[in-house]
UniProtKB/Swiss-Prot annotation:
The gene is rpsP. Gene3D superfamilies: 3.30.1320.10. This is Small ribosomal subunit protein bS16. It comes from Haemophilus ducreyi (strain 35000HP / ATCC 700724). Belongs to the bacterial ribosomal protein bS16 family. Pfam families: Ribosomal_S16 (PF00886). The keyword Methyltransferase does not apply. Keywords: Ribonucleoprotein, Ribosomal protein. The keyword rRNA-binding does not apply.
């Protein structure tokens, strides 16, 4: 099954997440199909907190991809901001 989920990057105690489309059997930070955005939970000042290509999310969901719980809330937030 294909899922849209977060992969962790950044440094120790400074997380930065990529929002990716990946096979659910692959490891969290392993192989992915497509990168569709990022999420920076520690963004301060003018730094961008969330960037997400909502059109690509809709396209993948139409193909049968499932959203993780956290990504579902981020998609809702991105739609509200747009």
């Amino acid at each position: 099954m294909v899922t849209i989920r977060l992969t962790r990057g950044g440094a120790k105690k400074r997380p930065f997440y990529q929002i990716v489309v990946a096979d659910s059997r692959s490891p969290r930070d392993g192989r992915f199909i497509e990168r569709i955005g990022f999420f920076n939970p520690l963004a301060a000042g003018q730094a961008e907190r969330l960037r997400l290509d909502v059109a690509k999310v809709d396209a993948w969901v139409a193909k049968g991809a499932a959203l993780s719980e956290r990504v579902a809330t981020l998609v809702k937030e991105a739609r509200k901001a747009a």
